């Protein structure tokens, strides 16, 4: 029973890490896209 609980916690932790890295990847990508968009928006009037 105790061992089963441990694996459940481990699974939970793995899901948390995956979700965290996924969110981090999305924000990183969003930041890069935003930076490109701002750069383009600034260069357009010039």
From Swiss-Prot:
It is a single-pass membrane protein. The chain crosses the membrane at residues 12-34. It is found in: Cell membrane. One of its GO terms (cellular component) is plasma membrane. The keyword Membrane applies. Keywords: Cell membrane, Membrane, Transmembrane, Transmembrane helix. This is Uncharacterized membrane protein YrzT. It comes from Bacillus subtilis (strain 168). The lineage of its organism: Bacteria, Bacillati, Bacillota, Bacilli, Bacillales.
């Amino acid at each position: 029973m105790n061992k089963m609980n441990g694996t459940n916690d481990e699974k939970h932790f793995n899901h948390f890490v995956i979700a965290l890295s996924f969110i981090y990847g999305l924000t990183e990508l969003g930041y890069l896209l935003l930076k490109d968009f701002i750069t383009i928006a600034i260069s357009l009037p010039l």
